[in-house]
Design a protein with these regions (language model features):
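Short beta-strand to alpha-helix junction loop
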Residues: 79-82, 109-118, 159-177, 305-312
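C-terminal catalytic lobe of FAD-dependent flavoproteins
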Residues: 318-403
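Glycine-rich FAD pyrophosphate-binding loop
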Residues: 38-60
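Core beta-strand elements of the Rossmann-like FAD/NAD(P) dinucleotide-binding domain
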Residues: 17-19, 208-217
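Beta1/beta-strand and adjacent pyrophosphate-binding region of the FAD-binding site
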Residues: 17-29, 47
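Helical element adjacent to the flavin cofactor pocket in flavoenzyme catalytic cores
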Residues: 159-209, 213
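Dinucleotide-binding Rossmann-like beta1-alpha1 core, especially the glycine-rich loop
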Residues: 64-145, 267-269
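Active-site substrate-recognition segment that forms the wall
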Residues: 35-39, 64-66, 97-101, 105, ...
Length: 403
């Protein structure tokens, strides 16, 4: 009798309908979610819709820094940082170059006691996880790591040689290849034009080729486009655009004779990009009330290169003059503008919305490469098991609703 009941239960599981999930957006958020959903073998029927190419748009313009300790992610989310970092290291172990890892190390400068405290806590967490890290107050030692830095007006610096930066486009494509291998359908060059809602519940979506699809769940992974995407279901997604204006400098002498680490100050960051140096104003230093920093713009009108403002290059050159004077005379090689999707509290928006079956995985701002692995892992669990996690609760849509 027990054997018959077991067989009956197994048949029921085999014949159980798969949950049909549509993902809008093939950047790092959509790719990460597709991969984590694909791990629910035989339970999810997943289709990704990307209007252009996988890992393009804002993902392609990401700096890709995943530092073991800095101010981009509070230490309370250390597990999120570590999961992302080790996910990409695993990719690299499986296939060298699949995450685009450049192991330059990171130097995080302490400009005051509050920053110093954050750095020291981060170093302790990194060392507890088996990585190297040291807090340096010897100014000569700091200049050994970064000869062009000014050590005036700083307390010290945290340093590790274990991390560096990754490539968001490579990561996205690696995630998507893994997802496809597990049965996920990926449609590129296909734009979603409408999401079908009946009685405040998702029923499916329509694409620009006139095709209609039925889904139980639709997830918006469109980043800077989320406000536009949300309008399809009558949802006001509360995000702003902040300008990510990146500049590529050619150092004096054309090529540095040392490895330029990822350099982090509260106001800006820099890293090597081939023989050049990439610099950008930090996303946490952006003012959502400053129209030069933030607003609501059309991401479709972004140029592939250029589009930057004199305001930002002047700001960054002033920062270099005071803090890294050895490279301030660099030549400007190129620049680009991207829009970050930022909620008012600078944390992502994950999970359920007031529209049943319509979920969000957006608002990662400047931290997408860091946060996406843990965020989409937990979101996949919510979609497939209806189980929440502390991370999903902290980054839920409802926190942003006005009182």
């Amino acid at each position: 009798m027990h054997f018959k009941k077991t067989l009956k239960k197994e048949r029921q599981v085999k014949t159980m309908a798969k949950k049909k999930i549509g993902i809008i957006g093939g950047g790092i958020s959509g790719a990460g979610l597709a991969y984590h959903l694909s791990l629910y073998e035989g339970e999810a029927d997943v289709t990704v819709f990307e209007k252009d190419t996988i890992g393009g748009a804002s993902t392609a313009k990401s700096a890709g820094t995943v530092c073991l300790f800095d101010d981009s992610l509070k230490n309370r989310y250390w597990d999120v940082r570590l999961y992302g970092f080790e996910s990409y290291l695993k990719m690299e172990e499986e296939e060298e170059g699949s995450a685009g890892f450049d192991k330059t190390g990171t130097l995080v400068v302490a400009t005051n006691e509050e920053v110093e405290k954050v750095i020291k806590t981060g170093i302790a967490l990194a060392k507890a996880a088996g990585y190297t890290g040291e807090y340096i107050t010897d100014k000569d030692r700091i200049k050994e790591i970064l000869p062009d830095i000014s050590t005036e007006n700083i307390l010290g610096a945290g340093y590790t040689e274990d991390d560096g930066y990754f490539d968001g486009t490579m990561i996205s494509n690696t995630y998507m290849k893994k997802a496809q291998k597990n049965g996920v359908t990926v449609k590129t060059g296909v734009k979603v034009t409408d999401v079908k809602i009946v009685d405040n519940k998702v029923k499916g979506l329509t694409t620009d080729d006139g095709a209609e699809y039925e889904f139980d769940v639709v997830v918006d992974c469109t980043g800077p486009w989320s406000k536009i995407t949300g309008e399809m279901v009558g949802l006001n997604v509360p995000i702003w655009h902040t300008k990510a204006e990146a500049f590529f400098l050619c150092p004096p002498g054309k090529k540095l004779d040392y490895t330029f680490p990822v350099l982090k100050y509260p106001e800006f960051y820099a890293l090597r990009a081939g023989d050049n140096i990439f610099i950008c104003k930090s996303h946490l230093s952006m003012d959502l009330n400053n129209p030069m920093h933030a607003g609501q713009w059309d991401p479709d009108k972004l140029p592939a290169t250029g589009g930057t403002d004199d305001y930002f290059i002047d700001f960054l050159l002033d920062q270099l003059d005071a803090k890294v004077p050895g490279i301030v005379d660099s030549g400007l090689v190129s620049s680009w503008l991207s829009y970050r999707a930022e909620p008012k509290d600078f944390w992502p928006v994950l999970g359920k919305t007031p529209v049943e079956g319509y979920m969000l995985s957006t608002g990662f701002g400047g931290n997408g490469v860091i946060e996406v692995p843990a965020a989409t892992r937990d979101l996949a669990k919510l979609i497939m098991r209806d189980e929440s996690t502390p991370l999903l609760e902290n980054w839920a849509f409802e926190r942003l609703l006005e009182d």
